[in-house]
Curated annotation (Swiss-Prot):
Single GO molecular function: electron transfer activity
Domain (2Fe-2S ferredoxin-type) ranges: 68-170
Cofactors (names): [2Fe-2S] cluster
Binding site for [2Fe-2S] cluster: 105, 111, 114, 151
UniProt similarity note: Belongs to the adrenodoxin/putidaredoxin family.
Record's subunit section: Component of the mitochondrial core iron-sulfur cluster (ISC) complex composed of NFS1, LYRM4, NDUFAB1, ISCU, FXN, and FDX2; this complex is a heterohexamer containing two copies of each monomer. Form a heterodimer complex with NFS1. Interacts (in both their reduced and oxidized states) with the cysteine desulfurase complex; this interaction stimulates cysteine desulfurase activity, and serves as a reductant for Fe-S cluster assembly.
Gene label: FDX2
Range annotated as the organelle transit peptide: 1-52
Gene Ontology cellular component list: iron-sulfur cluster assembly complex; mitochondrial matrix; mitochondrion
Lineage: Eukaryota, Metazoa, Chordata, Craniata, Vertebrata
Identification of the protein by name: Ferredoxin-2, mitochondrial
Length: 183
């Protein structure tokens, strides 16, 4: 219920009131029975048009323009064509299609195990890497000019036909050997 209310732009105050069963109406955050002065400011919860990267809706894309076809090239050189949606990130897309792209930090920008090489024709279509991504790429083995982290590449219509090649090796710095399950 809260999610559907949030999509409609329900104020935070109303959601808190519903959850607590009281109306917050007095300065200082004390509750009352509906008497007193209501808070003068409200904040609205609103859903954006995008969805979290990597999530897949059961209904599939709504418009043909939402589909982005890309190719993964695995460590053995096998080409794996997949279809994603605008807003997906490359790490989650690869995992969803069984491509062996690790993502040890679960897309939190704390490792370089989702390191990929981006096809030269599409590299300039990506925004430049932020400093945190560059820091993680510095730890990636076999770094090249077209290296990026898959968790930081978000599919756009311009990436139609892009190729993401997995390097021959990756380095997982997790001490305890934890390997997360793909989302």
């Amino acid at each position: 219920m809260a999610a559907s209310m949030a999509r409609g732009g329900v104020s935070a105050r109303v959601l808190l009131q519903a959850a607590r069963g009281t109306w917050w109406n007095r300065p200082g955050g004390t509750s009352g029975s509906g008497e007193g002065v209501a808070l003068g400011t409200t904040r609205k919860f609103q859903a954006t048009g995008s969805r979290p990267a990597g999530e897949e809706d059961a209904g599939g894309p709504e418009r043909p323009g939402d589909v982005v076809n890309v190719v993964f090239v695995d460590r053995s050189g096998q080409r794996i064509p997949v279809s994603g949606r605008v807003g997906d990130n490359v790490l989650h897309l690869a995992q969803r299609h069984g491509v062996d792209l690790e993502g040890a930090c679960e897309a939190s920008l704390a490792c370089s195990t989702c390191h990929v090489y981006v096809s030269e024709d599409h590299l300039d279509l990506l925004p430049p890497p932020e400093e945190r991504e560059d820091d993680m790429l510095d730890m990636a083995p076999l770094l090249q000019e077209n290296s990026r982290l898959g968790c930081q590449i978000v599919l756009t219509p311009e990436l139609e036909g892009a190729e993401f090649t997995l390097p021959k090796i990756t380095r997982n710095f997790y001490v305890d050997g934890h390997v997360p399950k793909p989302h």
